[in-house]
Design a protein with these regions (language model features):
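An N-terminal hydrophobic leader/cap segment in hydrolases
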Residues: 15-89
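Catalytic histidine-centered segment of alpha/beta-hydrolase-like enzymes
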Residues: 300-311
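Short beta-strand/loop motif that positions the catalytic acidic residue
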Residues: 259-261, 266-268, 272
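Alpha/beta-hydrolase fold nucleophile elbow
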Residues: 173-184
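Hydrolase active-site cap/lid region
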Residues: 192-249, 256
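Conserved alpha/beta-hydrolase "acid-adjacent" motif
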Residues: 273-279
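Conserved alpha/beta-hydrolase
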Residues: 126-148
Length: 330
């Protein structure tokens, strides 16, 4: 107490006057507000703060399209429950859980879901692949569903999890061909996995929907849309992710896609406000593979292309996977 009194008494009077003016004018409150707001946004967006958050339930029950997707997906899953096997891998001490729908083929599609989504979300996207003769793997990403983990790392750690799942399919189920189907963050994870030297050659292709250049651009577009883009807020949110996960929002698929060598199908909406069309075109142009196709949809919200135009979506997917039919006689 004496030390504190000595400290306060040693502070010149003019310093107290300046501090009083700053507090009274609210200038000091702005940075405090930014710090609090950035942590709130980060925790709401990329941190699992309770076991119930991001569980195996619809993420947007108030949205009719989301609920229609969920309903159709659940119908498909229930109709094929006899083909389902519960699967589990561990990577870096994190338990990861999924469901493998084995229809007797030696090839499988792995659905890489977006932020907030569990394996239940993947059912809806599995339908055209199952119709085309592929087994299906849907998984709870880390920090989602039944899987362990606290943070969504926007594809970075998830990409290493994806590689672990591919090795599981190869070693435990005899799968010889894998295709990634990634939505938003899942698309980023697919690109990171496929440009990682440790990725098995079993992965033969990549389908993306709503792929962004880096998560930072998507985050800024979200903040602008919701009128929450306060000056200085984004750098603090970016700092939260760096502090908690060691990864940067400013690094993304646009930095590595030139190393992509497998066939690529990009599905993208001209109305996407988060993963904007100009960046989608740039990602496509930069992709290193010569076997690539970009299919534009005139309408469709972010991650909502299949429910908006199911026939066109499924046709594009089936044409893409058709090229693998002669490579493996199944």
């Amino acid at each position: 107490m004496d030390t504190l009194l000595q400290f306060f008494s040693s502070v010149p009077t003019f310093v107290w006057i300046i501090l009083g003016v700053l507090v009274g004018s609210g200038i000091l409150m702005y940075p405090i507000t930014l710090i609090v707001a950035s942590n709130m946004v980060y925790n709401a967006t990329l941190r699992r703060t309770s076991p119930e958050k991001w569980g195996r339930v619809p993420s947007f029950p108030e949205d009719p399209d989301s609920m229609k997707m969920d309903g159709l997906g659940m119908e498909w899953a229930e109709a094929h429950r006899d083909a389902m096997k519960e699967v589990h891998v561990v990577r870096d001490g994190v338990n990861l859980y999924g469901e493998y729908y084995d229809f007797g083929h030696k090839r499988a599609v792995m659905i890489l879901s977006g932020r907030t989504e569990s394996l239940r979300y993947g059912y809806f996207f599995a339908i055209p692949y199952a119709e085309a003769g592929w087994n299906i793997l849907v998984v709870d990403p880390r920090a989602h569903g039944k899987s362990d983990g606290e943070f969504n790392t926007v594809g970075f750690e998830e990409s290493l999890d994806d590689i672990a799942w591919v090795k599981h399919l190869r070693d435990c189920h005899g799968v010889r061909q894998v295709i990634f189907h990634g939505i938003c963050i899942g698309a980023a994870g697919g690109v990171y996995a496929l440009t990682n030297p440790d990725c098995p050659e079993t992965v033969k292709g990549l389908v993306t929907e709503g792929m962004y250049p880096n998560f930072g651009e998507s985050m800024k577009n979200h903040l602008i849309e919701r009128k929450k883009m306060m000056w200085g807020l984004y750098p603090l949110i970016r700092g939260c992710m760096r502090r908690h996960t060691g990864h940067s929002m400013d690094y993304g698929p646009i930095d590595v896609i030139h190393r992509l060598e497998v066939p690529l199908l990009m599905l993208h909406s001209k109305e996407d406000p988060y993963s904007t069309p100009p960046y989608a075109q740039k990602l496509f142009d930069l992709a290193g593979t010569s076997d690539k196709r970009l299919v534009w949809f005139e309408r469709g919200r972010h991650s909502m292309l299949r429910i908006t135009d199911t026939e066109r979506y499924d046709t594009a997917v089936k044409e893409f996977v058709g090229q693998f039919d002669t490579a493996l006689h199944i």
